[in-house]
Each structure stands twice: as structure tokens, then as C-alpha cells.
């Protein structure tokens, strides 16, 4: 099973840079990069909530579940 983070897609639609998003969410650009590049092992609900507020989206717009074949 894989969880894919489609943050780049939503960021592009909202025309927001990684630096701007990190600042508004209150996380470091390095941590945002880890999340964007699907390297994160976990994400706090509070961080996900902030990202959704800033990007005006739902968690399902950012996260995608890919089942194992």
C-alpha cells in the first residue's frame, strides 16, 4: 500500500510557492520538501489541517491511496 502526496498539483493550481506555503503553515521548507517528495513517514493532523486551510482544499485533494497489486 502506498499513500501518495499530490501537494505539488494543488500548490500549482493555487499558484503558491513552497516557501510561502511553509511559512503560512508554520513548518520549515525542509519539512515541506520531505512531505512533497513522498519521503514523510507520518504527518500530523494539525499540519494537514493548516495545509488544507492555506490551500483551501480537502485532505483528499492532497493525499491519494494506491493499493498493492
Where are these regions (language model features)?
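Residues within the helices of the helix-turn-helix
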Residues: 8, 19, 49
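A short, Lys/Arg-rich alpha-helix, primarily the initiator
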Residues: 1-16
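Short alpha-helical DNA-recognition segment
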Residues: 16-34
Amino acid at each position: 500500500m502506498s499513500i501518495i502526496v499530490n501537494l505539488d498539483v494543488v500548490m500549482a493550481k493555487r499558484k503558491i510557492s513552497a516557501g510561502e506555503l511553509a511559512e503560512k503553515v508554520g513548518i520549515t521548507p525542509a519539512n515541506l520538501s520531505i512531505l512533497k517528495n513522498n519521503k514523510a513517514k507520518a504527518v500530523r493532523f494539525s499540519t494537514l489541517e493548516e495545509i488544507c486551510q492555506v490551500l483551501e482544499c480537502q485532505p483528499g485533494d492532497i493525499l491519494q491511496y494506491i493499493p498493492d497489486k
